[in-house]
């Protein structure tokens, strides 16, 4: 299964073929499966709404392969007992482990909890079509186990993500004359605020909240005030 996932390109928002693979795999195992977009999920055979539910979740989308690859990223290669390929670690390996654990317990009648297995999409881009799009379909969840590469250590907390697209509005003018209002100069003050601001609250486990300015776009010509 992991080798198949590696060899099917599944960039974020383009995971339809790996979603097809996962859906077919569950169905072949006799598991009733649900799908919305490229999110695939299933419940244990003896699901009981009076019991607490444990969510098993990981994602099947990947980032683009970087230029440093020395092997074919879309070829599952085993060397020295290790499996190489794009998504083998993040997060195909954890995903397959969770799926196999789910199947191992799928038809048990004596479980004190329900199991909900969700293989989700668009994780790498925090996309609207990812896990957040199906939360209302999953029902109440007591606790979640998320498969991610954590060096085989249990991780009990994680920083969230908020992306801000900020705009500074200027007025165009010729760069050689004292005219226009430079949007870059306006933005510098705000960029410095992002760099120096300290939030009053800190996480006991993760420390202070960090804000970083990562992309700046401005101007169209060297001689025009943006």
Model-derived regions: residue spans:
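Predominant activation on well-ordered alpha-helical scaffold segments within soluble catalytic domains
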Residues: 3, 23, 96-99, 103, ...
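Acidic-enriched catalytic cores of C-N bond-cleaving enzymes acting on peptides and small amides
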Residues: 176-225
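Glycine/serine-rich anion-binding loops at beta->alpha junctions
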Residues: 64, 82-97, 174
């Amino acid at each position: 299964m992991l080798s198949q996932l590696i060899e099917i390109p599944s960039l974020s928002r383009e995971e339809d073929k790996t979603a097809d693979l996962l859906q077919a795999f569950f169905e072949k195992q006799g598991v009733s499966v649900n799908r919305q977009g490229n999110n695939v999920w299933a419940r244990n055979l003896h699901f009981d709404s009076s019991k607490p539910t444990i969510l098993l979740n990981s994602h099947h989308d990947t980032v683009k392969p970087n230029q440093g690859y020395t092997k074919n990223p879309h070829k599952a290669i085993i060397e020295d007992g290790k499996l190489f390929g794009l998504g083998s670690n993040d997060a195909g390996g954890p995903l397959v482990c969770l799926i196999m654990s789910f199947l191992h317990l799928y038809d048990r009648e004596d479980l004190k909890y329900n199991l909900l297995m969700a293989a989700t999409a668009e994780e790498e881009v925090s996309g609207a079509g990812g896990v957040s799009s199906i939360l209302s379909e999953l029902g109440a969840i007591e606790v979640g186990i998320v498969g991610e590469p954590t060096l085989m250590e249990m991780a009990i907390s994680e920083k969230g993500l908020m992306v801000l697209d900020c705009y500074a509005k200027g007025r165009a003018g010729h760069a050689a004359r004292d005219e226009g209002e430079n949007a870059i100069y306006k933005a510098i003050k705000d960029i410095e605020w992002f760099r120096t601001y300290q939030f009053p609250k800190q996480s006991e486990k993760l420390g202070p909240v960090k804000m970083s300015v990562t992309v700046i776009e401005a101007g169209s010509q060297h001689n025009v005030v943006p």
